[in-house]
């Protein structure tokens, strides 16, 4: 990645202006029709993280065309400083220690000069010292070793000999690029190479003292995985096995730090097993963690202190420590009837930052002080959306009887009868929509549409529900969506003659499949970065030597090889002759996940077939709609198209 300019620059004047009102009062309810700009812009407030000692808060504030990373003290709310972000794609903000903030940024570019390979999204680390008000990109340079100045995985912070040390995986250059583990010792941010691997799929586990406890290595060509432990500068093979797709995953350490917790997949279910780091023996499976969709780790030790269980309409936070669980239960009581997510916490959990979603507060960030037993609203995520539309949890039976959970967002101020409907399947498809603030669904509801977001089979509701989607692309995963339309029509909520389908990524595929392989359900389709040609998509994965990815997609799609006739059967591009409704394609030029080519070839095929089709190209946009300008472009293009082909009034 070129580094012709720093991704951040310090700008204390704008920081002071923007940070002065991080704590804000609730505004009056919004007007009936909220403009698209209110949803298309990046959030007014995001990435709100509290310092380890609980005395400071960092956050990203966007006002008009100004976007800043800011730091303020809690209590007096004094501004310590800030850094101007501009159009940098900021992905994550976290504290290294009480004086340093680490920002992860990304950009789309080819490999560095002298190397071949596909254009991809490259991630870099930037350090912001809040005492010296200095912004410095972290350097992975280790002479004479050749390295790329990029990060390729999760970071970890440990305290080593009284000094904060950041650990991050990067890339070293041998005959090809290989993953390496680096350390950065603060305050100088001194860089050290501590390990490297010859296999692309490698992960390291750092113990509380900052030593490598173990690493996971996957040999893609052999489908062989290994877990090796590290002691006295010697590697010992602790476990190995073969897996074409579902490999083990290191999660963190046990409560006493003596064991590494590894998640295995057995008979489709997740199983946690402890590996004793002293003698490399395996303990009995742990029941308490098997159902967690995500673990909660102690920041400076990597010890697992709890987890999150995903359910259809909420997430359940579970802490193993009784006092921490009491903290969380008190928080839930402070926000009755609202959905709460833990955004960040002080090291002792006495102060936590929360995302709060609900009818009372809308979508806000809040600070809860355990000792004061008091919650304070820090600010609204979207300033101009004070009263979001209701997002209602629903469920309905699919044709084969499987219960499909989902969410229905209803426009404000209208009768819940015979509404125009937008079906909006999520991407992934191994993902799931959850109850909260969805800027895209809210934007459509503000225009007068009901929005159905089904968690079709193949979604990550639980392991069996996920597996129910294997081999069902364009089949039952597709009819799960239209079954939702029929259900809502039967309930009298929507008008079945006024339904369109809109989606991104896999959702974009589903939108195209809904008007090529189905007929009479939808009046129009909007595909954002959708897959149209599965054969071409599979070829792009194979060309990049992503063998485990290829096997993953083959299983999910339900094909056995590049010559499988089912590829054509479920590729929208092979069925353009069946299209009898207008289609809008939207795609970012910088998309490195679903190539822009997927929309380009679909455009040509539909035009050759004489169908009604448009393509809206988003310049400098990636797969994730990361920029305000192009996110708004997508909303404006899709809403104009929907109003022309499925008027809400």
Model-derived features: positions:
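N-terminal export leaders
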Residues: 5-11
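Bacterial N-terminal signal peptides
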Residues: 14-24
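Beta-propeller folds
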Residues: 19, 30-352, 359-361
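Signal peptide processing junction and immediate N-terminal pro/mature segment
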Residues: 24-30
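Short coil/loop residues immediately preceding or within conserved phosphate-binding loops
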Residues: 36, 45, 66, 90, ...
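Non-catalytic accessory segments flanking enzyme active sites
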Residues: 202-205, 307, 316-413, 439-442, ...
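Cap/lid segment of the alpha/beta-hydrolase catalytic domain
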Residues: 385-497, 504-505, 539
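Active-site-proximal cap/loop segments of hydrolase catalytic domains
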Residues: 456-649
